[in-house]
Amino acid sequence: HLSALCAQTQTAGRGRAEHTWVTPPHGALTVSVVLRPVVPAARLDWLPLLAGLAVQRTLEPRLEGTGWRARTKWPNDVVVLPTDAPADASAVDAPGWGLSRKVAGILCELIPASERIENSGAAGPAGRRGGLERARAEASAVIVGIGVNLAQGAAELPVPWAASLAGLGVDSELTVVRGVLEDLGRHLAELVASWEDRDGDPDGGDGELGRCLREACSTLGQDVVVTTPAGLVRGRAIDVRPGLVLRDAVGGPAGEDGAEEFVISAGDVASARLGTPTGT
């Protein structure tokens, strides 16, 4: 639990939907973290958003004074947005991304245990206190892959809507892989522990974890178009549960047009104003 493998460079990086990329030596943080969260398996889908929040909290202080702020983007990205809107927004709009630029991506891969945690008798708070290590040993593992653009130049970035901390004006001392990894590990450990304390429900207890997840998510409150396995769905993004909740959804499976609320479990999100996603 919380062990990590960090690569100095990647030549065949793999993302969601089998997207691939390369990273130059020392240009990015590319790390895989093993987690064995003691939560019901049905709540593991919160992990990409939790990992994204850990990345956002790692990057936000580094961006201070640059004119950019870090936010998560459902389902598995971290982006930066300008703190002040430019005079001519159309000049910097990126198709499907608007004014935002992608600085990090996350991929979570489940490795099921022989005995799932919900069958171990230790998923509740009392069970965790009485046998946390046993419960963790029996829990499914999740490999959380995280890539953060740190020091790449513009020509080294894979797509026009990507950015690196160096390119955003972050001081080089704050883009050192080891320092970023240490801060990321601390935030991730704290968030996973808080999530476990709530039995995998971010809205449990005082609801603070759920509020933090939503406040960090740039997707919420936006009119979006989502490319899903069932087709395009348009609507206003109003919540994460952890699927993306759209209001006044149009599209998707037959019979869902005009649904007051429609929950999407997987898909690529773009601004409805700018059109369909071009990939991640």
What would you call each of these model-derived segments?
Residues 6-8, 32-34, 73, 107-109, ...:
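Short beta-strand segments
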Residues 111-115, 153, 240-245:
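Short, conserved beta-turn/loop elements at beta-strand boundaries and strand-helix junctions
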Residues 31, 55, 77, 147, ...:
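Residue-level signal for inorganic ion chemistry
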Residues 168-230, 275-279:
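Conserved, helical-rich catalytic subdomain that frames metal- and/or nucleotide-binding sites
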Residues 115-121, 134-167:
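Short, acidic (Asp/Glu-rich) active-site segment that either coordinates a divalent metal cofactor
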Residues 1-64, 79-105, 115-132, 174, ...:
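N-terminal lobe of the biotin/lipoate ligase/transferase fold
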